[in-house]
A protein has these predicted regions:
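Catalytic cores of secreted or luminal carbohydrate-active enzymes
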Residues: 530-561
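Aromatic- and carboxylate-enriched substrate-binding clefts and catalytic-loop regions
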Residues: 302-515, 521, 549, 554
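N-terminal secretory signal peptides that target proteins for export/translocation
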Residues: 1-18
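N-terminal secretory signal peptides and thylakoid transit peptides that target proteins
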Residues: 14-36
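Carbohydrate-binding surface patches
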Residues: 529-532, 537-540, 572-609
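Active-site loops and adjacent core secondary-structure elements that bind or stabilize anionic groups
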Residues: 526
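Carbohydrate-recognition beta-sandwich/jelly-roll modules
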Residues: 61-63, 67-300, 397
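C-terminal segment of N-terminal export signals and the immediately downstream linker at the start
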Residues: 22, 42-71
Length: 609
């Protein structure tokens, strides 16, 4: 085993200065941050017989009305007609109201002119909704089962994660967007919806069964489908086998959920200025960063990126010409990238093109930030022009940000079971929020072209699969407080790493090399990023120019340019920030590396912005 913290001495902890006024990507842009469903007494009507993997066999179907066996299983068969389906036309404050309990007729569920179809296929279950002119907000699908009580469970996140991911025991109220996996100590099973879902979906698991909630809202109101038959989601399962590593099991689940062909997986590494400059960069400083990064990168093979994050303004003294700057980055043998906020609208934009202020609820200060409604054709054209301009300047990576917040009115950590605040709607009432998000992502891809690398930040990665090359999977890391990097960066790298190479390349955010963050931590963070095969981006503040830092950067960038060593966490079921990582050594044998993320004083309970 290799130990990545050479000190391991009880040395005084390095200072982590905290500025009096911290800047984040949110606050920089003026941000002011400030399941109750149809229960059923029905029991499962289909077979639950043990198969060779210790799960519930799909093959044997028992007659309706027979009681369940007393034995509990680690695998729950959900590729069958559900045991209940309940619709909700609206949400008031925080609660769904006006439940419509549907009546089953074969694979179809009906009531009051609404129809949910549960089409059982060989390896999937397709859920569709027809509701006519009746506004529809939520669909609650329930499968009853005797679930093994000692399972540990992993869920995903709505957009970026915020340090909350992890394997935990059964928590019946836990909201698990998109997919979840279980482990009984021997076998890992997975359940999820495909990435072409047209509803915002989350799962719940308890000892009496499984729930799938399909949010079909339009803004914060019920969608009005009219004559449309909405294919809400396709449910998939990944039944594990004894002896399979849990990481491989979750990776296989992610692969099975891909509804589109994933973009080519290529090494992504280089420079991003945010976590040392925090919006204070200039064209000149970007070129200096580019020269520094290129000088430490391998001369052949995949070229590094130099990404300009938030704070640039074309045609100003600090940023005189963004097209000329892109050319300057290319001349220095790097690939230029640029941060954009696609839905941001200028002051004076006609209200008819904008999203309603009501999407922010009581957070009225947020309404000062104007955003286009992407269901308005003229607003779509404004978004298209913005992206065309960036591609026309010659940028080879577009990092688009804030679209989930701008569209839905909340950050991921605020959403819980409700991604939007009730009481408002989009201009086009016939589209679900999930559909509008995918249409926006497709518009961005079409606007910049197939050759440009598209990086989604504050985006719903599950819905961006096959559209995005790269996805920021966690909230911001930091060049000002190590705790933020430990909590946000290490957590998202480890727990969402199964998405790397299946959905897209995962981007856990940058290594912010500054005086405020102890090098002994950043050195390890840099190392594990490069070895994992995830995007390895560096904000190189002045300390990065030290000899030890430059040597570590040279090694890490060389490894990242080659795609890493497929390092994966081995203690990810025991901790939210795994410290033991296994990779394939040059000899072909596995090698384990031990990292130390907390230091002698332990992790901080306090988190800076």
């Amino acid at each position: 085993m290799k130990f990545m913290d050479d000190s391991k001495k009880q040395e005084p902890r390095e200072a982590e200065p905290m500025p009096s006024k911290q800047v984040t990507r949110r606050s920089f842009l003026g941000r002011s941050i400030a399941g109750i469903g149809g229960l059923t007494t029905l029991r499962a009507t289909e077979a639950q017989l043990t198969d060779e993997s210790g799960g519930v066999g799909r093959a044997a179907v028992r007659s309706q009305g027979r009681s369940l066996k007393s034995k509990r299983f680690s695998f729950v068969e959900i590729l069958r007609v559900p045991d209940s389906v309940t619709l909700y036309g609206a949400v008031v404050k925080t609660l769904p109201v006006n439940p419509i309990r549907l009546v089953r007729n074969g694979e179809q569920w009906t009531s009051k002119g609404c129809v949910v179809e549960s089409e059982v296929g060989k390896d999937s279950l397709v859920l569709t909704l027809t509701a006519g002119t009746m506004p529809m907000s939520l669909v609650h699908v329930r499968w009853t089962a005797d679930v093994m009580p000692n399972l540990i469970v992993l869920g995903d996140a709505w957009e970026r994660s915020y340090g909350e991911l992890g394997w935990r025991g059964i928590e019946p109220e836990r909201v698990m967007p998109w997919y979840f996996a279980t482990h009984d100590g021997t076998i890992c099973h997975g359940y999820g919806v495909r990435t072409d879902a047209r509803a915002l979906c989350f799962w719940q698991l308890d000892q009496e069964g499984v729930s799938l909630w399909l949010n079909v809202m339009n803004g914060g109101s019920g969608v009005i489908l009219g004559e449309r038959r909405l294919v809400m989601a396709t449910v998939m399962i990944q039944q594990g086998q004894s002896g399979e590593e849990p990481f491989s099991g979750v990776q296989s689940l992610c692969r099975s959920l891909c509804a589109r062909t994933s973009r080519p997986i290529v090494p992504i590494y280089g420079a991003n200025d945010w976590c040392y400059s925090y919006g204070r960069s200039t064209a000149e400083s970007i070129l200096r960063d580019t020269e520094f990064t290129v000088g430490l990168s391998p001369r052949g093979g995949v070229r590094p990126y130099s990404v300009i994050d938030g704070g640039w303004e074309n045609g100003t003294p600090r940023w005189p010409d963004m097209g000329v700057l892109a050319d300057g980055i290319k001349q220095r043998r790097a690939r230029p990238g640029l941060w954009v906020r696609p839905l941001e609208a200028a002051i004076g934009t006609p209200r008819s093109l904008l999203l309603p202020d009501a999407r922010f609820g009581q957070a009225v200060a947020r309404a000062q930030e104007l955003a286009y409604d992407p269901t308005v054709p003229e607003a779509q054209q404004k978004i298209r022009e913005k992206l065309h301009q960036v591609a026309g300047w010659g940028y080879e990576m577009v990092k688009h940000d804030f679209s989930t917040y701008d569209l839905l009115g909340q950050w991921g950590f605020e959403m819980g079971p409700m991604p939007t605040i009730p009481g408002w709607a989009l201009n086009d009432r016939s589209r679900t929020n999930a559909e509008v998000l995918v249409e926006l992502y497709t518009l961005i891809r079409e606007s910049v072209g197939e050759a440009v690398i598209v990086n989604g930040c504050n985006t719903v990665g599950h819905l961006g699969q096959g559209i995005f090359d790269l996805q920021r999977t966690g909230d911001d890391t930091s060049g000002r407080q190590w705790e933020r990097t430990r909590r946000m960066g290490v957590n998202t790298l480890a727990l969402r790493l199964p998405q790397n190479g299946t959905f897209f390349v995962v981007d856990p955010d940058v290594v912010g090399i500054t005086e405020a963050v102890p090098w002994k931590f950043n050195r390890q963070w840099l190392d594990v990023l490069a070895r994992s095969g995830a995007a390895t981006m560096v904000s190189a503040g002045p300390p990065a120019h030290g000899p030890e830092q430059m040597a570590a950067l040279r090694d890490a960038l060389a490894l990242a340019s080659a795609g890493g060593n497929a390092a994966r966490p081995t203690d990810w079921m025991q901790t939210s920030t795994p410290e033991r990582w296994q990779e394939k050594a040059d000899s072909g044998r596995s090698e384990t590396r031990q990292y130390y993320w907390s230091g002698p004083e332990g992790a901080s309970p306090f988190l800076g912005p």
